[in-house]
Amino acid sequence: MERTFIAIKPDGVQRGLVGEILQRFERRGFKLVGLKLMQVSEALAQKHYAEHKERPFFGGLVAFITSSPVVAVVLEGKGVVATARAMMGVTNPLNSPLGTIRGDYGIDIGRNIIHGSDSLESAEREIALWFAPAELLEWQATLGSWVYE
């Protein structure tokens, strides 16, 4: 079964949106297999955003993600990478439709509430970066037959 990495960023944590965001994914039928509240180190932030290292906004990304706690999440389910991205909306909240997480709660591109892996390859890399294997729980959800054919 497919897995993805989600980070509820400092603005989402500070605004008390963690429960609402997790609820959306659970109601969609995705299973939580990893969940932790953490203070992101500068080293982890730099590794996570390494692809943006040469961009002018890199320092701001690192400063923001390390400024306050983040909720790191691993979700599992059929098509979870693409579906989670659709549920989040586009990067700029002002261009995200209402009904998406960013469309409903975001105001500014620099405070867009949530990060989600953009591909299976990114998901694997990000999950390995943010979680030790022992932090991911293998468990059987009984709702599977009610969600998938």
UniProtKB/Swiss-Prot annotation:
Cofactor: Mg(2+)
Residues engaged in binding ATP: 9, 57, 85, 91, 102, 112
InterPro entries registered for this protein in UniProt: NDK-like_dom, NDK-like_dom_sf, Nucleoside_diP_kinase, Nucleoside_diP_kinase_AS
SUPFAM superfamilies per UniProt: Nucleoside diphosphate kinase, NDK
Top-level class of the enzyme under EC nomenclature: transferase
Keyword Membrane: no
Catalytic residues, chain numbering: 115
BP GO terms, sorted: CTP biosynthetic process; GTP biosynthetic process; UTP biosynthetic process
Keyword annotations of the record: ATP-binding, Cytoplasm, Kinase, Magnesium, Metal-binding, Nucleotide metabolism, Nucleotide-binding, Phosphoprotein, Transferase
Subcellular location: Cytoplasm
Pfam families, A to Z: NDK
Molecular function GO labels: ATP binding; metal ion binding; nucleoside diphosphate kinase activity
One annotated Gene Ontology cellular component of this protein: cytoplasm
This enzyme's EC code(s): 2.7.4.6
The reaction(s) this protein catalyses: a 2'-deoxyribonucleoside 5'-diphosphate + ATP = a 2'-deoxyribonucleoside 5'-triphosphate + ADP; a ribonucleoside 5'-diphosphate + ATP = a ribonucleoside 5'-triphosphate + ADP
Subunit structure comment from the entry: Homotetramer.
Role according to the record: Major role in the synthesis of nucleoside triphosphates other than ATP. The ATP gamma phosphate is transferred to the NDP beta phosphate via a ping-pong mechanism, using a phosphorylated active-site intermediate.
HAMAP family, alphabetized: NDP_kinase
Similarity comment: family membership: Belongs to the NDK family.
Classification via NCBIfam families: PRK00668.1
Protein name (database record): Nucleoside diphosphate kinase
Native organism: Gloeobacter violaceus (strain ATCC 29082 / PCC 7421)
Highest classification ranks of the organism: Bacteria, Bacillati, Cyanobacteriota, Cyanophyceae, Gloeobacterales
